[in-house]
């Protein structure tokens, strides 16, 4: 399964959201932390175990937005 993670640089940090999962969004002071928090939320909302391998691929950048692809087996 492949889903998008959108990370946006804001004035006070970074926000991350997964548009395909309702209410799956987070905020952090740095990019790595917001990615980690969003991955944890994806695991929760998609009912994935901690052992499920997830690859994070930086796909593209558009202005202040960075699009990542989260790749995992469901």
Sequence positions of predicted segments:
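Short, charged, surface-exposed hinge/linker loops at domain edges
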Residues: 1-2, 36-74
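Well-ordered beta-strand positions in beta-sheet-rich domains
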Residues: 2-4, 25
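Short aromatic-glycine-(Arg/Gly/Cys) micro-motifs in beta-strand/loop hairpins
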Residues: 6-21
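Surface loops and adjacent helix of pleckstrin homology
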Residues: 19, 29, 51
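A short, exposed loop/beta-hairpin motif centered on an aromatic-Gly-Thr core
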Residues: 22-33
């Amino acid at each position: 399964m492949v889903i998008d993670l959108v990370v946006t640089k804001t004035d006070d940090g970074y926000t991350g959201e997964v548009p395909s999962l309702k209410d799956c969004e987070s905020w952090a002071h740095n990019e790595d932390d917001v990615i980690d928090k969003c991955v944890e939320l994806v695991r929760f909302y998609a009912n994935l175990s901690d052992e499920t391998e997830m690859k994070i691929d930086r796909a593209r950048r558009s202005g202040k937005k960075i699009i990542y692809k989260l790749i995992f087996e469901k």
